[in-house]
Each structure stands twice: as structure tokens, then as C-alpha cells.
Amino acid sequence: MSDKIAAIATGRARTGIGILRLSGDGCIEAAGQVFKLNSGKPLSSLPDRKLALGTLFDAQGRPVDHCMAFISRAPHSYTGEDTAEIQCHGSPAALTAGLEALFAAGFRQARPGEFTRRAFLNGQMDLTQAEAVIDLIDAETADAAANAAGQVAGAIRKKIDPIYDGWVDLCAHFHAVLDYPDEDIDPFSLSGYEASLTDSSRQLTALLASCHRGRMVQSGIKAVILGSPNAGKSTLLNRLSGFDRVIVTDIPGTTRDTVEQTVTLGRHLVRLVDTAGIRDTQDVIEKIGVDRSMEAVKDCDVALFVVDDSKPLTDEDRRAMDAALEAPEAIAILNKQDLAAVIEPSDLPFSYIIPVSCKDGTGFDLLEQAFDMLFPDDTPCDGSLLTNARQADAILRAKKSVDSAVRSLRAGMTPDAVLVDLEAAMDALGEVTGRTMREDITNRIFERFCVGK
């Protein structure tokens, strides 16, 4: 038996529609004490998932809103329990009054993520689907939303479950051979087992290979802005951000630390990192900033080398350019096209050279095109992209264990030795979907949700 929980699913801000979400045994009957149908019939008389008009009352029995509600009976609901939703006008006062009336009717306040936790515990979804709910809420681009929606529908589980189930069958056979040596069981087939485990390892490798693209879709392409002082790095960040994110002055060395800002560039989510201008300096604080600029290149996806095109290249420009070319991808941005250009593009060893004016905004369509070419949309965002670090870690551990099992087979070791590695692989892979559940992991996952989800 589960207790009755309630929450404002849409937050307490003033909105067009506000939703009270309910779940638990007996919640439909209890909700009927607070929401009365216009028909005069009890709320429990409604068929599942059919909206009906009614009135919401506060704890003193006073009407506070004319709204709609629907019910879903177990097990055909989000949580797998009896559930109800009351859809009001988005008045914080009305929603709060309705919630307090529900508490008086025997409900308690839902904890963060409790509706989705109940869905997981009741078998309505696995952990990958639960985590994808958060990703879908947080998605900032169409690609991120599409990938998260695919995972909510079970895309990762559909890849993991066949591998896990195959390992279960192998383990069962190994145990049968070991536990019943006198029975007429098929003999230990080295080549058959090795082929099966090797194939599953390849499938895990393919899934892990999608991590890099998945991270960029979900969290953004990390683009580090490099250049000498006063080349226009901070002005570039402000232009792409659409507001003055950082201070811009004519004084060299104004930016002394890295500054991050997430922006949308066409279909791309981009995490811009503005850095201190690269130059030799005696200022201790600025020197630390320059060192951080050099460090930022090491884990970026692309470096944006910004240079003032109205002046000849300096030694400081060349030092920044060399740092940018250490990145996996690099784009040269010839800034200040509103002035007379003096730099020859042939002097810059970049595949992508974009002339722009951060002052008036010209050339930024070309920068977007460069991102399209560097980061093509060549992988379908259907849920198959692995975006979650926890899941990737568990899959990597599973792959290492199954690879160890293959090596044991090739070395001619006995089935019990192979079983140790294979069962370790199963434990790790089971963590991905929650088959092998660790409470500390699930607590951490659902704590990330807001109340009402």
C-alpha cells in the first residue's frame, strides 16, 4: 500500500494553467472531497483519462476555482498507482489553497522526483527512462529534446536488455554445467561462448562511441575563445549571448579569468568559454588567467581564435593561434571588419576563417555555417545517443568485465573463472537500467527532480 501524495506540478509562479498532481492508493476517492464534478457525480465515476469540469474547494469548503480534472487507475498510469490531476487557472493562491485542502483530505507533500520514483519502483519505467525525463525537461535544443524523448520511450533499454538477457542465459548454462556434472547438458562450447561475448562487447563499444556526440547534444559544444588582449574575445561572447555578459574596455587584461555562457548557434547548443588574453605579463592574477586559458583548450571541442583584422599579426596573436591549433577543431575569426582589413587569410593555417564584426554583427551567419560543417547532424537524435555519465560509466565497467571473460575463455580457464567476470559484467550493466539497484544511486537520481515530477 502506498500513501497519498500531492504536489503543484507547475510551480507556484503565475501561469495560464496550474496543475495539482496526485498519486497513491485511494487518491481518487480522497481527491473527490476537494474537487466536485459539475455533474454532481463522484470523481471516481469518471472513465480513465477523460477531462471533466468541476469546482476546486479549499480546506474550509469555499470554492476557489472552476477547473478540470481527470483520473487514471492503476496500473495504467504514470506512477502505476491510482492518480489524478486537477488543472486550474495558474493562480498561486488558488493552487496553494487546493494543495492545503488535499493535505486536509489525507494527502502529504510529494518529495522531489517522487512521482517518477514510484513509476520506477512500480515497473512503469527503468532508470534510463527516469533520467531521460530530467533531460527532456532541461533540453535546450530540438536535437536534445528529440534524443531525450527517444530515451523516455526506452531507446537505451532496448539496446541494453538483449545483451543482459543473453548473459543471463550464458550464466545459467555455466551454472548448470558446474552444479550438475552428471546430467546430460551440452558441453562447454568455447567458440560459441566466445563469439557471443565478443559480439556483446562490440555492441557496448558502439553505444559508448555515441557518448561524445551525445554530450554535445545534451550539454553543448564546448568552444573556447582565444586571442591576444583586446582582439574582441569578450565582445564576441557578448554578441553571441545577446547581452553584455562580460565587461568590455579598451584596457588590455580586463578579462582575467574564464567566463562561461551557454548560447544557441543555429541548431547547436554551445558552451562558450571566454578567456584571458594570451600575452606575457608580470601581473600575478592576469598570469593565472593566461594559464587557465591554455588549460581550457585541453578539454574543449573547438577553439575560436579571435584576431583584430585591422592590425598586423603580433607575437601575442601567434602565441594564441598556436594554442588554438592544439584543439580538436579550430576556427579563425577575423574581427573588426567594420575597419580596414590588413591580415592575409593565407597567413592563418586554419580550415575555417570567418570575417566578422562583433560591433555590427556581420559575418555571424558564416560562423553558424562553420559549426554546421564541423559538427554535422549525421547521427539521428532518436534516443540512441548516450548522454548520461552514470550510464556510460556502468557500461564501460560492464565492457571491461566481459572483455576479461573473453580473455579467460581464450586462456582455457574453467567455467567458474569465466563466471566471476560475467557476473561482474551483469552487475554493472544492470545498474544502467536499475535491474541491479543501488539505493544510493537511485536516491541521487531522483533528488535531481523538482517537486511534482
Please describe what each predicted stretch is.
Residues L53-V64, A69-R73, G253-T281, D299:
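Switch I (G2) and immediately adjacent beta-strands of P-loop GTPase domains
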Residues R12, R62, H76, D126, ...:
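Conserved catalytic network of the ASCE P-loop NTPase/AAA+ motor domain
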Residues D3-I8, R12, A142-T264, T281-D283, ...:
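C-terminal-of-GTPase-core extension/linker across diverse P-loop GTPases
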Residues I278, E286-V290, R318:
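Short alpha-helix of the ABC ATPase nucleotide-binding domain corresponding to the H-loop/switch region
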Residues M1-A146, G150, G154, I331:
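A glycine-rich (often HGG/GG-containing) alpha/beta subdomain
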Residues L272, V306, I333:
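Generic enzyme active-site microenvironment
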Residues E286-S310:
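Inter-motif core of Ras-like GTPase G domains
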